[in-house]
Design a protein with these regions (language model features):
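Short alpha-helical elements of helix-turn-helix
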Residues: 3, 42-45
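Short basic helix-loop element that most often maps to the first helix and adjoining turn
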Residues: 3-22
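Conserved hydrophobic/aromatic packing and binding residues within compact polymer-binding modules
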Residues: 5, 19-20, 30-33, 59
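A subset of signal/propeptide-processing and intrinsically disordered low-complexity segments
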Residues: 24-25, 29, 36, 44
Length: 73
């Protein structure tokens, strides 16, 4: 899960649906990005950075406990 992305979205006062609408993507696609299951393209991350005011490098971080992360990471 991208905890920083979720926190930034909530701090911006946006639901997942409202964020998806702002990004002009489906709710499911946004949910997969926030869950760390999809990466999204650079335009999405640029827009997320603009909306939240948080650098996209921080937003992209996936929690170490995410099941897709290896033990070495």
């Amino acid at each position: 899960m991208r905890k920083k992305l979720k926190e930034a979205r909530q701090a911006a006062g946006l639901t997942q649906q409202k964020m998806a609408d702002r990004l002009e993507i489906s709710l499911r696609y946004y949910q997969q990005i926030e869950a760390g299951q999809r990466t999204g393209d650079f335009q999405i991350w640029d827009t997320l950075e603009d909306i939240t005011g948080v650098h996209q490098r921080k937003l992209r971080e996936i929690e170490a406990t995410h099941p897709d992360r290896g033990a070495n990471q």
